[in-house]
């Protein structure tokens, strides 16, 4: 499939995912293209060319005057598919693509890195809405529970799409939700651990270290059962809430020493 894509796009069909191939694939990985306006272009012609919709283009470019396009002007054109896949394993690189895609499709979505993981991967926080009621959702504290990440991201995408179209989510007007509340999502708390579990972590010292830790607990499947971050720390046990009880439970399960 990769070689066929390379041939179609005039690239060397070597089957290698190199820099040129990555650039050519970027619109399909991130869900949008950046089009440079040419004489005669209209939003309708762009929607036809990219198999998209006028509404999606207008949502992605809120300051755009559709009747005054200028040659050389750059326009974000959403492509006709979801940015958030739910049928493949997730990883930190996929999260980066999804964050980029959603913020370009829905510029009102605010994204920031609130920190870095042990391996320097960004820990993203995404905020939608400007209401007084503030709500925080987080996912993937535990690496082997990564399925919570696409669940949260798909909810966010569904909410943003519905708000842009004036539709409802579970019977509630999406625009009203974002007017009344500010929703902040931290959808991948443990990017390194998730990369380990889903097979995206490359070979190297970090992976060798996790294998050594896992060898001390042979009853836990490795890497599928890995819950901690890449340093062996259970992130969900780092909050001052019932910590003594959690420690007693972990000791009873045989986790009686630091990793």
Label every PLM stretch briefly.
Residues 3-12:
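Extended, structured, electrostatic nucleic-acid-contact surfaces
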Residues 132, 146-259:
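Active-site/substrate-binding loop(s) of hydrolase catalytic cores
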Residues 56, 78-119:
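Short glycine- and acidic-rich boundary segments immediately preceding or forming the N-terminal edge
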Residues 124-132, 140:
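Short beta-strand-to-loop junctions in surface cap/lid or active-site-entrance loops
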Residues 2, 120, 140, 185, ...:
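Divalent metal-coordination and catalytic microenvironments
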Residues 1-3, 23, 27-52, 73, ...:
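Primarily a LysM-type cell-wall glycan-binding module
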